[in-house]
């Protein structure tokens, strides 16, 4: 009989086995290392995190699920990982219902879930449980990490961001998603918390000599397992330029600086995600050497409306 219970510190190795068995079955997916999985779920110092559960059968972990912060207050991301040998037995559904109940107790407005398009049955499954397609994205990779040439843009400088720039970073974020529907309305304090929590390095494009800051590139470290060993990689989480300053080469200049930063850190690959209907961004990334790895869809459940299907 399968039992769902909160995560305990000794569960990490069992979770890792489930994670890597699942990755082996997925096209384009990378395995995890022990340290990478612990970092991803905030399991340092053997703490028990809120929002992480395992499914256990016969003393073995066969699946796990957790809630992670999304990009704005009131949103959470649901992740359910089931060992391939255990799929189709209802374990994933039981964990998903558990996550929805936990998210509702936290007064969450929206719960998101990500599924690769190579497995359309999972999207159908999420829709059965009340989720709806939200945004369709492409995962891209640059390997080896070679930064192409990018000329400086006259009248603008690219520099590392500091705490005083967080208000400008929030304004750029909000201008990139004016309806606030995708990532919510950012503010300076929220952006500062994000940088501190993620360890991101942010570079900005600033009009000289007196401003304003008009673009940003956010780079952070990720970790995958290659041949069973943890390998650090670069991840470009956000690249944005204020609408009035586009078509000047600032986006390319910021992207190249982000790639250079990844190379300086010795990361063997750079990864990013982009909306599939964002043709200018797709062209920019392809022109700098990024190649498509896999497509995925983000689904969203509005928790204030409708129960989870049984």
Located regions from the model:
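A short beta-loop-alpha structural element at the N-terminal edge
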Residues: 3-15, 157-171
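Conserved donor-binding loop and adjoining core beta-sheet/short helix segment
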Residues: 9-12, 19-106, 115-116, 214-232
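Glycine-rich acetyl-CoA-binding "A-motif" of GNAT/NAT acetyltransferases
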Residues: 49, 60-63, 121, 209-215, ...
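Acyl-donor-binding surface of acyltransferase catalytic domains
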Residues: 69-75, 83-154, 299-301
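Conserved hydrophobic beta-strand within the GNAT/NAT acetyltransferase core sheet
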Residues: 78-80, 111-115, 236, 270-274
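C-terminal "cap" of GNAT-fold acetyltransferases
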Residues: 139-159, 166, 268, 273-279, ...
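Phosphate-binding active sites in nucleotide-utilizing proteins
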Residues: 174-186, 193-207, 211-222
């Amino acid at each position: 009989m399968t039992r769902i219970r909160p995560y305990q510190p000794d569960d990490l190795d069992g979770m890792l086995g489930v994670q890597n068995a699942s990755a082996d079955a997925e096209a384009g997916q990378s395995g995890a290392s022990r340290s990478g999985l612990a970092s991803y779920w905030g399991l340092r110092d053997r703490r028990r995190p809120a929002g992480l559960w395992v499914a256990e059968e016969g003393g073995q972990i066969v699946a796990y699920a957790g809630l992670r912060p999304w990009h704005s207050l009131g949103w959470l991301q649901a992740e359910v990982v089931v060992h391939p040998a255990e799929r189709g037995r209802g374990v994933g559904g039981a964990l998903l219902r558990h996550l929805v109940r936990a998210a509702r107790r936290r007064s969450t407005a929206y719960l998101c879930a990500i599924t690769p398009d190579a497995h359309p049955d999972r999207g159908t499954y999420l829709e059965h449980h009340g989720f709806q397609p939200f945004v369709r994205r492409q995962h891209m990779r640059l390997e080896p990490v070679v930064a192409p040439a990018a000329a400086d843009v006259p009248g603008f400088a690219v520099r590392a961001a500091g705490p005083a720039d967080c208000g400008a970073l929030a304004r750029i974020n909000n201008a990139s998603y004016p309806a606030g529907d995708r990532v919510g309305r950012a503010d300076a304090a929220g952006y500062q918390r994000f940088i501190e929590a993620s360890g991101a390095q942010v570079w900005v494009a600033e009009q000289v000599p007196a401003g304003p800051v008009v673009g940003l590139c956010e780079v952070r470290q990720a970790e995958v397992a290659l041949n069973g060993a943890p390998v650090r990689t670069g991840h470009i989480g956000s690249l944005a330029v204020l609408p009035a300053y586009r078509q000047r080469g600032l986006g390319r200049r910021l992207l190249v600086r982000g790639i250079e930063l990844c190379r300086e850190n010795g990361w063997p690959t750079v990864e990013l995600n982009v909306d599939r209907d964002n043709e200018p961004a797709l062209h920019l990334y392809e022109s700098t050497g990024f190649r498509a790895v896999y497509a995925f869809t983000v689904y969203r459940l509005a928790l204030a409306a409708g129960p989870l299907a049984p």
